[in-house]
């Protein structure tokens, strides 16, 4: 019995790692450019097309001056916004050095035949840390937003607490694994679909690791919604689920 239990645990662990792989695997191969190198190109008035791969809400809230806003999830629908000249330099970036959206978009551009494509190393935080300027078309006021740990959220669900689970991850990430009962409105669609959300229930926002949900919560709070965030995002939920399923091995008789 112990062997069977051990094998089950091994298979469960392998399945968990496979679930994580598409979202948190290694960054796809794409050339990187440092904030200093990019700043030098911009100072030299080089012909560079900057592309912000975040949602429209994030793009309006903070971006490198002169950037196009082309969310990774809408790449195929917005190919016409890319330059006709396949030799132009394209620089993609997103909200953190852990974000894969910029790498995915960069590789898609290369597949279309663009020859000079790179990704900003460190993303937008790296740009800011280097001391360079960002712009905001519509800065979202920040406020204190509570968060709920996975164990507490699990208890809420078991007790039937009247909450609304809003998963703002991409459609692909949602299909690969979601919390039962959650509704998927990806962040890039939130500015167009927030009115579909209920005003009479607390909304629990779920993202990848608990970072993007803060800005999304501030945005919804400004619209009159009562929000909280899943601490650590879906990553923490999966970790908690894995730990709760782990059973101690029985004693040898």
Stretches with model-predicted labels:
Residues 12-13, 23:
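Cleavable N-terminal signal peptides
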Residues 54, 169:
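Anionic group-transfer/hydrolysis microenvironments
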Residues 2-6, 19-36, 44, 48-49, ...:
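Rhodanese-like catalytic fold shared by cysteine-dependent sulfurtransferases
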């Amino acid at each position: 019995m112990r062997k069977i239990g051990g094998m089950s645990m091994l298979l469960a662990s392998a399945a968990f790692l496979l679930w994580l792989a598409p979202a948190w695997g290694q960054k796809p191969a794409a050339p990187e450019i440092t904030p200093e190198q990019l700043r030098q190109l911009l100072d030299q008035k080089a012909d560079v097309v900057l592309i912000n791969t975040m949602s429209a809400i994030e793009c309006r809230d903070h971006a490198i001056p002169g950037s196009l806003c082309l969310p990774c999830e809408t790449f195929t629908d917005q190919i016409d916004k890319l330059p006709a000249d396949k030799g132009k330099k394209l620089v993609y970036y997103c909200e953190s050095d852990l974000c894969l959206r910029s790498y995915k978009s960069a590789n898609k551009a290369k597949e279309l035949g663009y020859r000079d494509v790179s990704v900003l190393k460190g993303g937008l935080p790296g740009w800011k840390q280097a001391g360079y300027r960002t712009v905001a078309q519509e800065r979202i006021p920040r406020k204190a937003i509570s968060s709920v740990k996975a164990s507490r959220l699990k208890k809420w669900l078991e007790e039937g607490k009247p909450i609304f689970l809003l998963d703002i991850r991409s459609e692909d990430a949602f299909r690969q694994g979601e919390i039962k009962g959650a509704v998927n409105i990806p962040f890039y669609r939130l500015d167009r679909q927030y009115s579909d959300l209920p005003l009479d229930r607390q909304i629990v926002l779920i993202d990848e690791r608990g970072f993007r949900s803060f800005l999304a919560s501030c945005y919804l709070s400004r619209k009159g919604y009562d929000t909280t965030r899943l601490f650590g995002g879906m990553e923490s939920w999966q970790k908690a689920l894995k730990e709760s399923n782990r059973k101690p091995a029985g004693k040898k008789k």
